[in-house]
Regions:
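A structural signal for conserved, well-ordered secondary-structure elements
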Residues: 1-355
Length: 355
């Protein structure tokens, strides 16, 4: 930990610097690979919607010693068409999910389960969701997502600047797209718990991005007036100054989510925990990546296209004080912008005592 603390101090002071902004094409290429894989997964496999969204019937039997194969065989004997999903929940529960059934078919499934497992029909937890209700839930979930993005974009545009809002939304869409693609790849059901997980990672990704952008705004406030360094150089220092904090926060967030995913869902077989924890785990990891490697470089790309910033980059290059970030791939060069020194409460003038 002392080594990590020392690295954080060197990154903050500028003694050590990683060229996050200058290597933007490398980060974009990595994201492009994951996005293409997500597109392929969505096109080939698609999302496996739960019965809450597409409609269907769910039957949960609570009895120790029952197996998935036995439950699947008992329902297959009824002659149900379509996909039948059987999940083991813990040691004593089995959940059977089917498509939309008529009342006669539903009663036949319940009767088959009572005969196969020797239980009372009242002990079977039956849930039937109509297709129209599932479509309504899907529509409301999409409306909520779009409303969230619009409100966040307006807030960031007013609190920071419009281009920061654009970069933050690009990072959020990047996170959601990759998370949804991995979800389609592993084949987990998309349930209301999954939607909650998606909305949660949107909030976390924006939170981490806003912290980085706040430091970027501080470092670039008077970058054109000073004229000693480019916008990308100032933004790169801001990323270096916040990366250790982002890594620590993300690690602390991932540890409990990982324990829920691998222990709670993997060993105990809790379906709801699995749906929620997988979305959170992937989203937190991807959100941390985008807040460092996607949002700041994309913001720098937008700002460096401005005529004022292009003129600033030419002035800096002509002086020969330090080359613009785009022209160098060094990861250990000391940046020309330095954080404020001799500031803070310890360095303030002391008040004289009253006589």
């Amino acid at each position: 930990m002392s080594k990590l603390s020392g690295l954080g101090g060197r990154l903050y002071s500028g003694e050590t610097s990683f060229n996050f902004i200058g290597n933007r094409r490398r980060w974009y290429s990595i994201s492009a690979i994951f996005i293409l894989a997500s597109i392929a997964a969505l096109a080939i496999q698609g999302l496996h919607l739960g019965i809450e969204f597409k409609g269907g019937s769910s039957y949960t039997v609570n009895k120790s010693g029952i197996s998935v194969e036995q439950a699947r065989a008992s329902v297959a004997d009824v002659g149900i068409e379509g996909e039948i999903i059987v999940q083991k929940i813990g040691d004593s529960k089995v959940r059977i999910q089917t498509g939309a059934l008529t009342s006669e078919q539903s009663k036949a499934v319940e009767l088959a389960l009572t005969q196969a497992f020797n239980v009372e029909i009242e002990s079977i937890d039956t849930q039937i969701v109509g297709p129209s209700w599932g479509k309504e839930i899907t529509k409301k979930a999409l409306y909520g997502l779009f409303a969230f993005l619009i409100v966040i974009m307006l807030f960031l545009a007013m609190a920071f600047e419009p281009k920061m809002a654009i970069a933050a939304i690009v990072a959020v869409v990047h996170d959601v797209f990759i998370t949804v693609g991995i979800y389609a790849l592993v084949g987990f059901d998309v349930t209301p718990a999954t939607i909650i997980g998606f909305l949660t990672i949107l909030g976390y990704s924006l939170y981490d991005t806003v912290v980085v952008f706040d430091k970027v705004r501080e470092n670039t406030k008077s970058v054109a007036a000073v004229g000693k360094y480019t916008y990308s150089q100032a933004a790169n220092l801001a990323v270096n100054q916040t990366i250790v904090r982002s890594a620590n926060t993300s690690l602390i967030a991932l540890l409990p989510v990982g324990s829920i995913l691998f222990v709670g869902a993997g060993l105990l077989g809790a379906g709801t925990l699995k749906d929620l924890s997988l979305a959170l785990f992937i989203g937190l990891a991807v959100g941390t990546y985008s807040s460092i490697f996607i949002a700041p470089p994309f913001l720098a790309s937008l700002r460096e296209k401005e005529p004022a910033m292009q003129a600033l980059a030419k002035r800096v290059a002509s002086r020969g004080n330090s080359a613009p970030v785009e022209a160098t791939s060094s990861q250990s060069a000391r940046p020309s912008i330095q954080p404020s020194a001799n500031r803070g409460p310890r360095n303030q003038p002391k008040r004289k005592g009253r006589k």
